[in-house]
Amino acid sequence: MIDLFAIVNKGGIVLWKKTNSLVNLKCLQVLFHEAFLSEQRTVNNTVTFDRYTMQYQEATQYSIVFVVVFQDLKCMAYSQSLLNSAHNIFLNLFKEKLEDRQVPNEAEVEKLFAPIFNRKSAQLENETDTKSLPVEANNDNSARKKNEYEMKKKGAQSKQTNAPKKGKKQLRKWDDQITEEEQAALNYSSQASSASQTVDNSQLSSIVGNNNKFQKTGSGDVIISDLEMDPNQTISNKSASSAFSLFSNLIGGKYLKEEDLSPILKQMQEHLTKKNVANSIALELCESVKASLINKKVGSFDTVKNTVNKAFRDRLTQILTPSTSLDLLHSIRSVRKNENRPYTISLIGVNGVGKSTTLAKIAYWLLSNNFRILVAACDTFRSGAIEQLGVHVKNLQSLKGSSIELFAQGYGKDSSFVVKNAVEYAKQNSFDVILIDTAGRRHNDQRLMGSLEKFTKATKLDKIFQVAEALVGTDSLAQAKHFQASLYHRPLDGFIISKVDTVGQLVGVMVGMVYAVRVPIIFVGIGQTYSDLRTLSVDWVVDQLMK
């Protein structure tokens, strides 16, 4: 049985999906990276990730991709037929709408497409079950094919069976995802001698943290796991203990009126505010949901609670889902290949939000992808700022040797001058990425924010990310707006939310910041070690808000 079938547009939005088992939705992100963003081409429209095999078929003219995900290799016998059928059924049903450059909504797909698809899927599965894969005891070709199936299933997870040579330390495997042998970036570098290390091996381990959150794709890229409560967690539709118990007293089979919704939406607004969503945004969110539900008929098989639950989830997902690609690795490689210059990333933010630590985490991840990193120390005012960066760089050198360096020109220098010199140095020494640390500044201090505008105007940066704390309340909105306004004729490129591990379910600040300036969350920080960096799972955030 297939584990997941999904219809996804090229923007990464899931139009419709059917799951038959718990599936880590990270696999869809990996598929899009491998199939459409990576320079390496996929073979037979197939991508492997973790324990999953993914096959896809694209309706190129409409930018729609049909995806089937499975673990049981028997599914390979009919997966392509299922994709072909799904492709033809979907285009026949919605051709007129697609020709008008419209996309059917989930309800339309569920009503028209799902019944036909389910019958076809069951038919193909039953036909496969009546047959067995041809295995002949004396047929070498059959045995070879069977072995190929087994190797494909294991993929990058296949284990070394040869015993290590005597006297050599046995290499460690990190939850079947990345080995030290495959990814030297995630362990002690052979280039750094023990004499030059600033910390011993036991200290290095505590600094690095839990590396199994970094996962290796088929093309060799090391990607960061989504923020989830558990690495195997999948998104649940449970709502018994959620805020939507507020709607249990409404009866199905009626047209919803404003008087039905207003009292309960007021309670919902209070619930969101308690989750750290700014009051103004919680109010606007509730008003938006109310407008979408008034005069909507709720059938007897579609409870009011589920209807309102879905409306809130859809709106929150719309707010948090990025409208552009967040594939930083692809952007870096594109600039290096096409423009032959270092890629520049600057971190900005108020004092004390963890910019230096966040920069070190990003550096560690980029080093794991074999980029050469130059760290530019542009906080030339805060006492000890350069030394703090120096500690991080020395630690990372202990892990990766000369692949990372610190560029510093002392205190009191103009940050724009330092960046200009850093870029020249990076060009001369073949660095791939420059990570720029900047001075912390109060967002309501016009003098300090004015210097940020001067810095942005004088330096042509590829990305500017604002680092912000998860637990700052409604002040986060003011921070986001002021930093956005202080950049010279360009928007912020994204947020990095630090200290998310300290807020539990109070994740509403993320909604507020994204909503305030319409830029996405690139990463979230969940601790102090170099591997405590995650990408945002929109579904996870919505689940936390709705609990």
From Swiss-Prot:
Keywords: Endoplasmic reticulum, GTP-binding, Membrane, Nucleotide-binding, Receptor. The keyword Membrane applies. Residues 142-153 have a biased composition (Basic and acidic residues). Residues 124-174 are annotated as: Disordered. It comes from the Eukaryota. One of its GO terms (molecular function) is GTPase activity. GO terms for cellular component: cytosol; endoplasmic reticulum membrane; nucleus; signal recognition particle receptor complex. GTP binds at residues 349-356, 437-441, 498-501. InterPro entries: AAA+_ATPase, Longin-like_dom_sf, P-loop_NTPase, Sig_recog_particle_rcpt_asu_N, Signal_recog_particl_SRP54_hlx, SRP/SRP_N, SRP54_GTPase_dom, SRP54_N_sf. It holds the Pfam family SRP54_N. One of its GO terms (biological process) is protein targeting to ER. It is a peripheral membrane protein. It is found in: Endoplasmic reticulum membrane. SMART domains: AAA, SRP54, SRP54_N. Residues 343-546 are annotated as: NG domain. The NG domain, also named G domain, is a special guanosine triphosphatase (GTPase) domain, which forms a guanosine 5'-triphosphate (GTP)-dependent complex with a homologous NG domain in the signal recognition particle (SRP) complex subunit SRP54. The two NG domains undergo cooperative rearrangements upon their assembly, which culminate in the reciprocal activation of the GTPase activity of one another. GTPase induced rearrangement of SR drives SRP-mediated cotranslational protein translocation into the ER. Heterodimer of an alpha and a beta chain. Belongs to the GTP-binding SRP family. PANTHER family: SIGNAL RECOGNITION PARTICLE RECEPTOR SUBUNIT ALPHA. This is Signal recognition particle receptor subunit alpha homolog. The gene is srp101.
